[in-house]
């Protein structure tokens, strides 16, 4: 019986230490909403009621002085994920489309990799817009070469094969994304490490 009490005390202590360590690290939730202005949320004077966002703003940290060199989808996401100016990427203007190749190199230190190195689990949900490594059907490359990634229709993709070069390749533990918000592919991609 004393061994059982000692074991219980050890397990309980271990649990308390683990819980204390987890509490030392704050949760990080980063919300990037396209076409959402600073004053659109109700906590900032907006007319729309946004109680959950308001609560996050009250209980967390808000950054209210941000600047960008390109306020469209891909460059903004590239800057947030890599911490680099968007013009340092291979995309010098515009946005990536649903069939575009990955923009962020897998060997680059990214925000999610940095967070992982500091004990966080990371995930991304929503519009990806940073390119994916789709596997093509036979003759799919020829068809895509004709239409280009901006007009690709998704028929050339082999949906039975693994998608590479996405969120997991640059440090996210989990993802549930759509490749882009405009013409195909509208398919969702869910993955876990």
Residue spans for each PLM region:
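Bacterial N-terminal signal peptides
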Residues: 5-16
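Formylglycine-dependent sulfatase
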Residues: 5, 20-193
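N-terminal hydrophobic targeting signals that begin at the initiator methionine
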Residues: 1-2
